[in-house]
Swiss-Prot record:
Cited NCBIfam families: Neo-PentlctneDsynPtlE (NF045818)
Keyword annotations: Antibiotic biosynthesis, FAD, Flavoprotein, Monooxygenase, NADP, Oxidoreductase
EC identifiers of the protein: 1.14.13.171
Protein name per UniProt: Neopentalenolactone D synthase
Pfam family, one: NAD_binding_8
First-level EC class: oxidoreductase
Family: Belongs to the FAD-binding monooxygenase family.
Additional remarks: S.avermitilis does not produce pentalenolactone itself in vivo but instead a group of new metabolites that are neopentalenolactone derivatives.
Cofactors demanded by this protein: FAD
Function in brief: Catalyzes the flavin-dependent Baeyer-Villiger oxidation of 1-deoxy-11-oxopentalenic acid to neopentalenolactone D in the biosynthesis of neopentalenolactone antibiotic.
Pathway annotation from the record: Antibiotic biosynthesis; neopentalenolactone biosynthesis
Species for this entry: Streptomyces avermitilis (strain ATCC 31267 / DSM 46492 / JCM 5070 / NBRC 14893 / NCIMB 12804 / NRRL 8165 / MA-4680)
Tree of life domain: Bacteria
Length: 594
């Protein structure tokens, strides 16, 4: 019999160790004296003359979201010029920036990598490498002619709406002035690295870099490992999240000694990767990927399906939850359902903690690697070699008891009052969060709509949108983000749904012979009311979680509720968009001549 109160008490104890009053301020942006941590190590700077022209659509962001939107617009609309603008040296977004050793997707490749069927491609493994995903992004850009008009190594500095011409004026750090009928922002959330705010960081004299800007010139090797230049180096890595879980085994194989500085352990389940089966691939029928994506989306959202097409760690979690729920859940007391969910969560977490004991030999190290929180407080990890790494004699886990690193000296890391000399320090500290950093801060540029209103002013108290995609006062402008939209573990799935929806709207605008489309004030108001009505469903859960990305470092109530994702679940959100399109009346949108 599980003592649920004892479990809750243990989780609270571990959470309280880690809560800091300054919340998200315990991190630094890669700006000012730390700007070099965000430099592009993958491309040589290019020189070009400023561009001054007019295009149909400007998409800011050339990651998976921008590529999907460009592809869906090519399929649906008669646009001559679709322009991608990105500060990176190529398309790919997070898969351009992140090239650390061991990098793979943690969602099955066949549902994660979009447009496989359209391109006639299949990944080589169930969980593809970052290099393969990056190459697939490049293939999307080539297939849909998105390279031709692209402005890469270019950062937007301002978007402003010109009412007289019904055009957006797009200004960049290259001196460009682009007049665009429509603009869309597909900024993403994994492109602005953040650093832990550790005293002495600026004085550290060893080599250091962020995992999203991996320095292979220093480490040697490539994305597959083989970091031969670390053979005589003492290496420290700060962080044990999803990135660190993948690169730590490769660092351990190559470094003279590796120190892993841990605040909070991750859950690490079996990955069970394998090559793509040629026989299975040969039997795929038209529409296979959309069916597989829909199946995975439904199962991982708690919607029962006749068959599990993916059969991975994500869907296994869901099946265990379904097995413990009351059989007549529709008629059950919500409190009983909540308790059943909590028990299912506990049993899964116990299974993961026992896995640590079964693999890690040293008891103290094993105990430090055991996660004590609800499963989805942090993104679950899947890896078949991470835990074994701690059995190596050249690896030391420095568990900071939830407090983090104390300070850096010119030559060492200080944690728990002890000094650890290192030659190289790697920050696996993640990115500026969509949950804790205002959207207009993360874009890095100002957005000025009709009558001179700035998006930063309109969203001062939180986002205000229609379906998370359009904003009243900002005509012909679309935003792909998590705010007031659907949220799911398979991010490209939701980006694809958003992209199809935007493409539908713009095709309808073209078919109706109109030039301008804008969310109505009424439509925006009613959607905001919907967001507010559903926003607090998960607040108690997120508040109980260990500090991290999903709860603003333990302070979820300090995040504007208006920045929440749609509280009715991602399946519900996708169905709302689908029903809206099926009505074919463009409800709550205003169309007019330019």
């Amino acid at each position: 019999m599980v003592d649920i109160e004892a479990v809750r008490a243990k989780y609270r104890e571990e959470r309280d160790k880690r809560v800091q009053a300054d919340g998200g301020r315990q991190y630094l942006s890669a700006q000012g004296e730390f700007a070099h941590y965000a430099d592009d190590p993958h491309a040589k700077p290019i020189e070009r003359a400023p561009v001054s022209d007019e295009v149909d659509v400007t998409i800011i962001g050339a990651g998976i979201g921008g590529l999907l939107l460009g592809a869906r617009l090519r399929e649906a609309c008669a646009f001559d010029t679709i322009r991608l603008v990105d500060k990176a040296g190529d398309v790919g977004g997070t898969w351009y920036w992140n090239r650390f050793p061991g990098l793979r997707c943690d969602v099955e490749s066949y549902v994660y990598m979009p447009l496989l069927e359209e391109l006639g491609r299949l990944p080589s493994e169930k969980y593809a490498t970052g290099a393969e995903i990056f190459e697939h992004c490049q293939a999307i850009a080539r297939t849909y002619d998105l390279y031709d008009e692209a402005l890469l190594q270019t950062s937007v500095t301002e978007l402003s709406w010109d009412e007289d011409s019904s055009r957006w004026l797009v200004r960049t750090d290259r001196g460009d002035l682009v007049r665009s009928r429509f603009v869309a922002m597909a900024i993403g959330s994994l492109h602005r690295p953040k650093l832990p705010s550790i005293p002495g960081t600026e004085a550290f004299q060893g080599h250091s870099f962020h995992t999203s800007r991996w320095d292979f010139a220093y480490t040697g090797g490539d994305i597959s490992g083989g970091l031969e230049k670390l053979g005589d180096k003492r290496v420290g890595i700060v962080g044990t999240g999803a990135t660190a879980v993948q690169c730590i085994p490769h660092l351990a194989e190559s470094a003279a000694h590796l120190y892993v500085f841990q605040r909070t352990p991750s859950t690490v389940s079996v990955r069970n990767n394998r090559p793509t089966d040629p026989g299975w691939a040969a039997g795929l029928e038209p529409g296979w990927q959309q069916r597989r994506m829909d199946n995975f989306h439904a199962l991982t959202s708690g919607v029962d399906q006749d068959v599990d097409l993916v059969q991975d760690g994500w869907t296994e979690i869901t099946s265990k939850l379904a097995a413990i729920l009351p059989k007549s859940a529709a008629d059950a007391d919500p409190k009983d359902i909540g308790t059943a969910v909590e028990l299912a969560d506990f049993h899964k977490m116990e299974e993961l903690r026992k896995r640590v004991d079964a693999i890690v030999h040293d008891k103290d190290t094993a105990d430090a690697l055991k996660p004590y929180y609800r499963l989805f407080c942090k993104r679950p990890c899947f890896h078949d070699g991470y835990l074994d790494t701690y059995n190596r004699p050249n690896v030391t886990l420095v568990d900071t008891q939830g407090r983090g690193v104390e300070r850096l000296t010119p030559t060492s890391v200080v944690a728990g009052g002890r000094e650890y000399p290192v030659d190289c320090l790697i920050f696996a500290s993640g990115y500026e969060s969509e949950f804790g950093v205002p959207y207009t801060n993360r874009t890095g540029f100002s957005i000025v709509g009709r009558d001179g209103i700035r998006l930063s002013e309109k969203w001062a108290e939180g986002a205000r949108t229609f379906h998370g995609l359009q904003v009243n006062g900002f005509p012909n402008c679309f935003i792909l983000s998590k705010a007031q939209s659907g949220l799911h573990v398979n991010v490209p799935y939701m980006l694809n749904e958003q992209s199809k929806h935007v493409a539908y709207i713009l095709k309808a605008v073209q078919q109706r012979g109109r030039q301008v489309v804008e969310a109505s004030a009424t439509g925006e108001k009613e959607w905001v009311e919907t967001i507010l009505r559903l926003a607090n469903r998960n607040l108690d859960f997120t508040e109980s979680c260990t500090p991290g990305l999903f709860n603003n470092e333990g302070n979820p109530r300090n995040v504007a509720i208006l920045n929440s994702s749609y509280g009715g679940g991602s399946v519900g959100f996708v169905n709302i968009l689908k029903r809206w399109r099926e009505a074919d009346d463009l409800a709550d949108l205003e169309l007019r001549e330019g």
